[in-house]
């Protein structure tokens, strides 16, 4: 039987980050949804809008505000994660 988690953080804890989809990892950064939309729903919409994580990487923050359920705090959290990834990629 396939295990279901109520939030991808539980899946990460149990199986490791490698086992999560891009949408699930992004949902962890988004943290919570809004009425009628889970963090995973919002994450999937973000990925559909920008095509991929790479497509998201250089978007102006204002573009993310077009997505219902993304607040300034959530967008800043995503931007910080991308900056950390850039710095790691540069060997920092």
Model-derived regions: residue spans:
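Long, highly charged, low-complexity intrinsically disordered interaction regions
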Residues: 1-67
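Basic, amphipathic DNA-recognition helix from helix-turn-helix-like DNA-binding domains
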Residues: 84-92
């Amino acid at each position: 039987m396939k295990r279901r988690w109520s939030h991808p953080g539980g899946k990460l804890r149990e199986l490791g980050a490698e086992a999560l989809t891009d949408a699930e990892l992004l949902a962890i950064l988004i943290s919570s949804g809004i009425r009628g939309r889970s963090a995973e729903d919002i994450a999937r919409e973000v990925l559909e809008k920008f095509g991929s994580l790479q497509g998201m990487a250089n978007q102006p923050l204002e573009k993310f505000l077009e997505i219902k359920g993304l607040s300034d705090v959530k967008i800043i959290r995503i931007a910080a994660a991308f900056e950390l990834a850039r710095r790691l990629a540069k060997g920092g």
